[in-house]
Structures are given as C-alpha cells and as structure tokens.
Amino acid sequence: MMKILIIEDTPNKKTAIEEVIGALFKGTANHYGVTWAEDLNSAQRFLYTDQFDLVIFDMYLPDTKNIGLERDCSSELITVFSQSKNYNSEAIALTQFEISEVDNIQLFNKAGITLVNYDESNAWKTALELKLNRVAQKIKCDFLIFCALTKERAAFSDTEAVLGDTQNISGLDCQEIKIGDHYGFIVKPSEMGLVSMAIASSKAIELFQPKIVAMSGICAGVHGESNYLDIIVGKVCWEYQTGKWKDGEFKQEPMQASLDSNLKIDLEQSKDDIGLITQVRNNLFESELATMKIRIAPISSGSAVIADSTMMERIGSQHRKMAGLEMEMYSLYEAAAQSLCRPLYFGAKAVVDMGDSSKGDKFHDIGCLTSARYVSIMLKRQLEKLQ
C-alpha cells in the first residue's frame, strides 16, 4: 500500500490536496493511506518513526497544534527529512510564496524536495500528480506470496485472505491479495522449477519492495521424517543438484539458505499452536489430517520431478533430517536474502507423496489448501509485528 505523509494545517489546502489524490487513484488498483501532521512536532515524529512513499510539505506550521503561531519551519523539516529513513522518498513542498521569495531554496534542492507555488492555477496540481504517478509506478506492497502452480494460488480463496484481480505487472503474473489490513500479490512464475522461480522472485522482490515474502504449495515427503499432509516449513533449504562430476562420480556440494533467527522462533512455536492447527484443518476431513504435524525442518529443492525411491534416498543422504523435497523454495530464499530490500522469508509446503513410484495427485487439492491457510495465518501475524 502506498503511504503518503501530508504536513499541512490549513483546512482548505488539506481538502484540495486530498481531492487531487482521490481523483488520480479513483478506479485504479492502487491502495493508499494518508497520514496527517498538523504541526512541527508531529511531522518530525512521523518522519523519524515511519517510512513513506511520498511526503508533501508545508513550510509554515505551529510547533504544537492549537498552541502558538505559525512560523517558517522549513529548515527543521528539511533537516529531519534528510536524516530520516525517508531521505530517499519522493517529496514535494507546496508554498503560497513565490519561489523567488524563498530564501533557503538551496536546502530544498539539496534534499531532493520539489518546491512548487500553491496558487489558484493548476500548476501545483500537475506537479503533485507527477509525484503521485512516479510513486504509483513503484507499486510497493506489504508482502508477496509465490506459488508455482495455479491450484496452489487458487487455494487462497478458502483462507481468511481476500483475493482480488489478476494483473500482468512488468511481465509478472500477479493476483491481488489482502490479509487483514495489508495488501500484497500472489506471484506465479511462467513454469515450475528453480530457474523460473529465481527469475520471478528476484524481479518481484526488487519491484514491489515487500516487508516479507512466503511460498506455499505441495511437496514430497521423506519416510521417517514426515508423513502425508504434514506441513514442512523450510528451516534450511538447498539445491541438491549442485556439485561436481569427476571420474564418473557425482560429488555433492549443497549450498544452504536459512531462516532469520527471530522468524524461525515464531515458526517453531507455531507447530505447537493448537488454535492454528485447528484453523488449518477446519472443515477438512481426510483421515491423514488427524495426525498432521507442522514440521520446521530441512527441505531440498531441485528442478526435476522425482518419483523414484532410490533417488529420494540419495538426495536424503545430504541431510539426515531432510523432511521434504520440492522444486522452487531454494530460489526464493536466495532471491530474498540477496535482494536490496532484504525482506523476511519462509516457505511452507504440504506433503502429498513420498517421491516414489506410487506418486499421485490424491492429496494435491487438500495439500494446496492447508499450506495456503498456514501461510496466510503466519503472514498475518508477522505483518502485525512489522507495522
């Protein structure tokens, strides 16, 4: 969701600014929230404590609302803006003075704040619309979910999340989703596998700048470490195909990606959360769900579909506690870990087969649903912490 801070205490001017913003985004998929600061103290507090996509400045404010007279606060505001986490945000100052009359115009220029005369003409509206359009093109969101299959994404329709329209955004197959008060997208790559997921997740994370990313779906289990319809959360994840062939023998060299330590604690605690497990199983009656467990365990990724018990044993030898095998999670973990915005990340997939010759699709639909429910619940909890 686009976040806008408006520093303004004049009622008529506030109304005019709101009308421009509302008219520009009416009927579009852009969600936005406005925070108002009507005095210097609250403006400084918001700039220091929160991050905004656009900051709209007024130069003259009282130090405290309803106490004292307005004064020129531009120097203080620019200093705080430049030192805060918003220093790189889009910014515009609307002043009723002629630009030529502003003494400290160089301060605005150095801080990257566009200074515009607020008058009866429409010039200031055009300038504000340009800023809003520039911010809208960045399309930031709170979270992203990645699903390799259409049925994995469709399963979110039976969760507490609210699904919206599908969109083609910069070549990405996206579907709008809202969890609680937070907006995001479910992104589906063009194909299954590590390569397509690496491309889609890297591109989406840099484009949308989310706070947290997740993956849901289905996977193969490992005998002795997981059972049908268990949900496997990737504690560590690696690609089992990396290594070197030498003298007819493949020597493995798996590179691991792991979870953030604080997030891992929350995920570990979820496996004993009876209320959460009840929500995941609600109105589902497969007998295997009676013994379903949430396992925070090692999971391996590879680009091939495995339906061979011998190959499963060979891959499983890379980690004695490996509980699952799937085709995309390692790509997401690495894309998130190496991105510029460094979001939190986790993946959760339900066991629907054991990667042997009996592989089938009996549990696909229910596996997609239980993993989607778990992911939506955990995302809601984490997003509330990240506000």
Swiss-Prot record:
Gene3D superfamilies: 3.40.50.2300, Nucleoside phosphorylase domain. InterPro entries: CheY-like_superfamily, Nucleoside_phosphorylase_sf. It comes from the Bacteria. Keywords: Antiviral defense, Hydrolase, Phosphoprotein, Two-component regulatory system. The keyword Phosphoprotein applies. GO terms for molecular function: adenosylhomocysteine nucleosidase activity; methylthioadenosine nucleosidase activity. The purine nucleoside phosphorylase (PNP) domain is probably activated upon phosphorylation by DtcA. Its EC number is 3.5.99.-. Residues 140-387 are annotated as: Purine nucleoside phosphorylase domain. It catalyses: ATP + H2O = D-ribose 5-triphosphate + adenine; dATP + H2O = 2-deoxyribose 5-triphosphate + adenine. Probable response protein of the two-component regulatory system Detocs that confers resistance to bacteriophage. When the system (DtcA-DtcB-DtcC) is expressed in a susceptible E.coli (strain MG1655) it confers resistance to bacteriophages T2, T4, T5, T6 and SECphi27. Detocs inhibits T5 infection leading to growth arrest but not complete cell lysis, during SECphi27 infection leads to cell lysis. This is Detocs response regulatory ATP nucleosidase DtcC. The gene is dtcC.
